[in-house]
Amino acid sequence: MRNKLAAMANTLAQDDTVASDEIAAAIDYMEIKIRTAEARNEPVPFVAFRTRTILTIALKLRQESDLSL
């Protein structure tokens, strides 16, 4: 599973149709979804957790390679 997540994050990091600020906004949205579930004592939505992970890795890859998309 980890290799698939890394591959998806790498693809997103190199996608010039998605801006870095859009990725950051999506990370913030996923954080809200996760925190809301935690505050309600509900299970954390797996899709939100997985998506946040992919987005976070993609943004870090961009920052580390100085891609300013």
Predicted regions and their residues:
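N-terminal acidic leader/helix
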Residues: M1-E31, K60-L69
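Short, charge-rich amphipathic interface segments used for partner binding and complex assembly
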Residues: A25-E64
